UniProtKB/Swiss-Prot annotation:
The record marks 221 as: Important for catalytic activity. This is Adenosine deaminase. GO terms for biological process: adenosine catabolic process; hypoxanthine salvage; inosine biosynthetic process; nucleotide metabolic process; purine ribonucleoside monophosphate biosynthetic process. Its cofactor is Zn(2+). It comes from Erwinia tasmaniensis (strain DSM 17950 / CFBP 7177 / CIP 109463 / NCPPB 4357 / Et1/99). Its EC number is 3.5.4.4.
Length: 332
């Protein structure tokens, strides 16, 4: 359950994995694109997971239609604004929305830096209209290789003031983190915070690599950490947070059942683990579902859910003053 006395956060939430089906239809018509369906009901199986996908890459393919319709920078601005609206409607007080500007730019050849600027504009407009604090995490999509990731990093750093952190996402097995060392060195030099998708498709060594070589302060998913007791101890001792996404890990077949999910083990071990959505529109869920349905099915007690909710703000990429402001806004 969600504790109404605590700020509700979602710090692992993909902006480009949360494009409304209606928006996909609208933009498809606007740019005269051929979509796989012309009604919401018929489109949904193409853009939303109906049954668990066999692997992570199959799951990621569901995101493609959402970005294929981004035919202009205004379209990018629209989906960013709608993401803030969706988070506010879900009762979230603080969100970190992450996006891959190269992925969003790819289909229609948009300028990557322009996509970054449009997303920042949309987020700022959304925050001005709703009682929510949102920060942006730029993603480098490892699946497209080192050069494409460099272009993404260039675009993100061109608008550094609007970007809080850097992430690496995509095909973890095919494109291991060691290929992106120079990218992360540059990002850290620019003052960006670091989170990395690791231990989702690959094993515990991928998490070690993200921490030791890329400078990860948090780990996205990280389910394979349970395979390495020394890593579990290290995560707890060093305060390296885990951004858990329960339903997502079932839908990608990363974990067989919610009862098998390691989130409870993480919390019992003193790791700063959190509850997040991942790709709400693609998954057909919202943060409330993760607390009210997924977390109990994963064996979490009410107290453990409360701890996970507290951890969300604890490991957020905010200063202590900014965290206090989030708490004060809830109390007001």
């Amino acid at each position: 359950m969600i504790d109404s006395q605590l700020p509700l956060t979602d710090i692992h939430r993909h902006l480009d994995g949360n494009i409304r089906a209606q928006t996909i239809l609208d933009l498809g018509r606007e740019f005269n694109l051929t979509l796989p369906a012309t009604t919401l009901a018929a489109l949904r199986p193409h853009v939303q997971v109906i049954e668990a996908e066999p692997d992570l890459v199959s799951f990621l393919n569901k995101l493609d239609w959402g970005v294929k319709v981004l035919g202009s920078l205004d379209a990018c601005r629209r989906v960013a604004l709608e993401n803030v609206e969706d988070a506010a409607r879900a009762g979230i007080h603080y969100a970190e929305l992450r996006f891959s500007p190269g992925y969003m730019a790819m289909t229609h050849g948009l300028p990557v830096a322009g996509v970054v600027e449009a997303v920042i504009d949309g987020i700022r407009a959304g925050c001005a209209a709703h009682n929510i604090d949102v920060r942006l995490i730029g993603i480098m999509s490892r699946t497209f290789g080192e050069d494409a990731c460099l272009r993404e990093l260039d675009g993100l750093l061109a608008h550094r003031d609007g970007i809080t952190a850097l992430d690496l996402a995509g095909d973890e097995l095919g494109f291991p983190g060691r290929r992106f060392l120079s990218h992360f060195n540059r990002a850290r030099d620019a003052g960006l915070r670091i989170t990395v998708h690791a231990g989702e498709a690959a094993g515990a060594e991928s998490i070690w690599q993200a921490i030791r070589e890329l400078g990860a302060e948090r780990i996205g998913h990280g389910v394979k950490a349970v395979e390495d007791p020394a890593l579990m101890d290290f995560l707890a001792q060093e305060g390296i947070g885990i951004e858990s996404c329960l339903t997502s890990n079932i839908q990608t077949s990363t974990v067989a059942t919610l009862a098998d999910h390691p989130l409870k083990t993480f919390l019992n071990h003193g790791i700063l683990a959190t509850i997040n959505t991942d790709d709400p529109a693609v998954q057909g869920i919202e943060i409330e579902h993760e607390y009210h349905v997924a977390a109990p099915a994963a064996g979490l007690s009410v107290q453990q859910m409360r701890v996970a909710q507290e951890n969300g703000l604890k490991i957020a990429f905010l200063s202590e003053e900014e965290k206090a402001a989030v708490r004060a806004r809830l109390a007001a």
